[in-house]
Swiss-Prot record:
Effect on the protein of changing residue 209 to A: Strongly reduced reverse transcription activity
Result of changing residue 114 to A: Slight reduction in the number of virus-like particles produced
Name of the coding gene: gag
Alphabetized GO MF terms: RNA binding; structural constituent of virion; zinc ion binding
Site (Cleavage): 131-132, 215-216, 478-479
Motif window: PTAP/PSAP motif: 111-114
Lineage, top ranks: Viruses, Riboviria, Pararnavirae, Artverviricota, Revtraviricetes
Post-translational note: RNA-binding phosphoprotein p12 is phosphorylated on serine residues.
SMART domains xrefs: ZnF_C2HC (SM00343)
Positions where Phosphoserine occurs in the chain: 192
Ranges of Basic and acidic residues composition bias in the record: 163-178, 434-466, 486-519
ZnF (CCHC-type) ranges: 502-519
Effect of residue 212 to A: No effect on reverse transcription activity
Cystine bridges: none
Protein name: Gag polyprotein
Length: 538
């Protein structure tokens, strides 16, 4: 029976949830398919000895990291999250990685026992400390000092000879207690953890700090201007916490502008910044717009290749920032780069997009105005802060506000003389007087009850009216029937012929009256027939 071989790559795939969690702690995201591709196909081609099955060897991880973070076209920005996660697994290993980490630092000894001298550091492959590395601290080693802005002088960046690489393992804090020497107190610590991008001489190394910061150009101890390059955490926090240039060019342009002002980056730093925050197509568009902004000696835009290349070169120039001329070139380059960002971020005029910005149901007028102004900046060539555009912005603010606010703003007296600030204040008053959701629910409930009560009352009144009308009609019908019978009876009597003065009403003969009529029968009178009446039941 064969036995399954566990490799670093298969180990990470088997604990992929932990790998994703560690990557998230590094503010990056990793995908399993690309993780396998980079480990087994990409990094072995860097010629640093990376095995296809992966490794937790810190020296090899450091060498791959140098290749990945190389500035310019030789770097691999898309692989940064993956090598940073590999580095975190090796330098701060979880329990399932610790048995595979090699070489493993020596365990710390109790402070009371004399420590054995450590073996001299081996010659190791180059290691860049451009970015922070998480290393287990020794028990007796004090916390490394974080350099302040007034730290020791940095070394010249523009020379081409690389410095000797330091040993990746942290040196011991002191020598053997039986005669070993402690580190001299007067020795200055290494002024920068960014070893791969500094050139020239180096001070004696100390343990790396677990944090790194990017500083602007500053004067060192000898008065020479030096700088600290960007850190990976800064670059990728900027990338992950801001929208893309295509999605919101204004916000990303403002971020890059603040970085250009505070950090005063060199030409190489600008390329690294653009390569991290922009896509390839966005970067080419920005560079093209920046070169269009180059002006000639007459102050007008020029298209002369020599003047454009001198002001905004596409290849690394030989500008020495320690000289006034070099600093002037860098300042002009940053100004052109900012102009390129602003011009490339402008979208074609689209007033329909501006008209599509309407106030939300619970959005304050101030927030709505900011969105409206941002739409003007993004979709039109007009500046909403320009006094000449205040009328257009005011009309858009009125027409595109919430219906209740817009109606009241349109009825304001002397509307044409109102400024945009006046309209916003009036809109805020209307917005603040709106009923709360609880008040609205109570009003709707009360109106519903009142409506039901009115409908019930109206139904009762209609029913009573129908009953009265029915009784009235039946009464009329009954009265008509009774009146008809009476008229028939009375009418029959009235149809008798008129008698003379001496004529008998019974026999119609003259000479006597009916009471004396001999032809009239004598005797008791019979019962009179009763008249039938029509009742409501009939």
């Amino acid at each position: 029976m064969g036995q399954t071989v566990t490799t670093p790559l298969s180990l990470t795939l088997g604990h992929w949830k932990d790998v994703e969690r560690i990557a998230h702690n590094q503010s990056v995201d990793v995908k399993k398919r690309r993780w396998v591709t980079f480990c087994s196909a990409e990094w072995p081609t860097f010629n640093v000895g990376w095995p296809r099955d992966g490794t937790f060897n810190r020296d090899l991880i450091t060498q791959v990291k140098i290749k990945v973070f190389s500035p310019g076209p030789h770097g691999h920005p898309d692989q940064v999250p993956y090598i940073v996660t590999w580095e975190a697994l090796a330098f701060d290993p979880p329990p399932w990685v610790k048995p595979f980490v090699h070489p493993k630092p020596p365990p710390p000894l109790p402070p009371s026992a004399p420590s054995l001298p450590l073996e001299p550091p081996r010659s190791t492959p180059p290691r860049s400390s451009l970015y922070p590395a998480l290393t287990p601290s020794l028990g007796a080693k004090p916390k490394p000092q974080v350099l302040s802005d007034s730290g020791g002088p940095l070394i010249d960046l523009l020379t081409e000879d690389p410095p000797p690489y330091r040993d990746p393992r942290p040196p011991p804090s002191d020598r053997d207690g039986n005669g070993g020497e402690a580190t001299p107190a007067g020795e200055a610590p290494d002024p920068s953890p960014m070893a791969s991008r500094l050139r020239g001489r180096r001070e004696p190394p100390v343990a790396d700090s677990t944090t790194s910061q990017a500083f602007p150009l500053r004067a060192g101890g000898n008065g020479q201007l030096q700088y600290w390059p960007f850190s990976s955490s800064d670059l990728y926090n900027w990338k992950n916490n801001n929208p893309s240039f295509s999605e919101d060019p204004g916000k990303l342009t403002a971020l890059i502008e603040s970085v250009l002002i505070t950090h005063q980056p060199t030409w190489d730093d600008c390329q690294q910044l653009l390569g991290t925050l922009l896509t390839g197509e966005e970067k080419q568009r920005v560079l093209l717009e920046a070169r269009k902004a180059v002006r000639g000696d007459d102050g007008r835009p020029t298209q002369l290749p020599n003047e454009v290349d001198a002001a905004f070169p596409l290849e690394r120039p030989d500008w020495d920032y320690t000289t006034q001329a070099g600093r002037n070139h860098l300042v002009h380059y940053r100004q052109l780069l900012l102009a390129g960002l602003q011009n490339a971020g402008r979208s074609p005029t689209n007033l329909a997009k501006v008209k599509g910005i309407t106030q939300g149901p619970n959005e304050s007028p101030s927030a709505f105005l900011e969105r409206l102004k941002e739409a003007y900046r993004r979709y039109t060539p007009y500046d909403p802060e320009d006094p000449g555009q205040e009328t257009n912005v005011s009309m858009s603010f009125i027409w595109q506000s919430a219906p209740d606010i817009g109606r009241k703003l349109e009825r304001l007296e002397d509307l044409k003389n109102k400024t945009l600030g006046d309209l916003v204040r009036e809109a805020e008053k209307i917005f603040n007087k709106r009923e709360t959701p609880e008040e609205r629910e109570e009003r709707i409930r009360r109106e519903t009850e009142e409506k039901e009560e009115r409908r019930r009352t109206e139904d009762e009144q209609k029913e009573k009216e129908r009953d009265r009308r029915r009784h009235r009609e039946m009464s009329k019908l009954l009265a008509t029937v009774v009146s008809g019978q009476k008229q028939d009876r009375q009418g029959g009597e009235r149809r008798r012929s008129q008698l003379d003065r001496d004529q008998c009403a019974y026999c119609k003969e003259k000479g006597h009256w009916a009471k004396d009529c001999p032809k009239k029968p004598r005797g008791p009178r019979g019962p009179r027939p009763q008249t039938s009446l029509l009742t409501l039941d009939d």
